[in-house]
UniProtKB/Swiss-Prot annotation:
This is NAD(P)H-quinone oxidoreductase subunit K. It is a peripheral membrane protein. NDH-1 can be composed of about 15 different subunits; different subcomplexes with different compositions have been identified which probably have different functions. The lineage of its organism: Bacteria, Bacillati, Cyanobacteriota, Cyanophyceae, Oscillatoriophycideae. NDH-1 shuttles electrons from an unknown electron donor, via FMN and iron-sulfur (Fe-S) centers, to quinones in the respiratory and/or the photosynthetic chain. The immediate electron acceptor for the enzyme in this species is believed to be plastoquinone. Couples the redox reaction to proton translocation, and thus conserves the redox energy in a proton gradient. Cyanobacterial NDH-1 also plays a role in inorganic carbon-concentration. It comes from Gloeothece citriformis (strain PCC 7424) (Cyanothece sp. (strain PCC 7424)).
């Protein structure tokens, strides 16, 4: 062997060997590595496989689930998107919250979401799921928005939304999955969580004084005028009182 040639063991110091054999830091995907051609191709293939086989969890608590059930039928045929309904959260990667979420159902929903494998996605379907809907004003048990419990990827407004709207939400979710990268996939950013909803405060309805209300003692002014009934003196304006006094 020529004296000018050195063995591979002489090229590395003992400290460098320790770093190679026993790395301290965890492996991370850097920006340079994420732009690698091979890794980018594998990432696109992985995203294509995921968006082509989204398995939703059968979860429904109210009338919105009827529209979701119609989506499974032959008329709309959502199997063409690769969606296979699952009854177990451990086999699903998508949950469509269809219906009102109550305080008693909230822990069960969070438990189902936590049992789903990552990455997992959530579609909020219907007004009751998004803001509480018609129960948001005086209900003491309805949750005002499912995004206060679990993060939401896509919202579907409506009461209830039609199956075509669910298709539109699934298409938007597929586009979102297609743009995911291996660098940010574990973080699952661009999601909505703990959104504060500003609702208009109104006077309470259930006050216990319903039978004593003025509308129970006499019909409303608009109804009296429409039916040609004599307007009670309490509902008359100043001009109407003057006309009655004049005869």
């Amino acid at each position: 062997m020529s004296p000018n040639l050195t063995s591979s063991s002489d090229l590395f110091t003992q400290e460098q060997k320790e770093k190679l054999l026993n790395p301290i830091n965890h492996s991370q995907v850097t920006q340079d590595l994420s732009e690698n051609v091979i890794l980018t191709t594998v990432d696109d293939l992985y995203n294509w496989a995921r968006l082509s086989s989204l398995w939703p969890l059968l979860y429904g608590t109210a009338c919105c689930f009827i529209e979701f059930a119609a989506l499974i039928g032959s008329r709309f045929d959502f199997d063409r998107f690769g969606l296979v309904p699952r009854s177990s959260p451990r086999q699903a990667d998508l949950i469509i919250t269809a219906g009102t979420i109550t305080m008693k159902m909230a822990p069960a929903l969070v438990r189902l979401y936590e049992q789903m494998p990552d990455p997992k996605y959530v579609i909020a379907m219907g007004a009751c799921t998004i803001t509480g809907g018609m129960f948001s004003s005086d209900s003491t048990t309805a949750v005002r928005g499912v995004d206060k419990l679990i993060p939401v990827d896509v919202y579907i407004p409506g009461c209830p939304p039609r199956p075509e709207a669910i298709f539109d939400a699934i298409v938007k979710l597929r586009k979102k999955v297609a743009n995911d990268s291996i660098q940010v996939r574990p973080e699952q950013n661009h999601r909505y969580y703990s959104t504060t909803h500003t609702m208009k405060a109104t006077s309470p309805i259930l006050t216990g004084q319903y039978l004593r209300a003025q509308t129970r003692q006499a019909p409303p002014l608009e109804l009296s005028e429409a039916m040609g009934m004599p307007i009670p003196p309490a509902l008359m304006t100043t001009e109407q009182k003057e006309e009655v006094d004049r005869g």
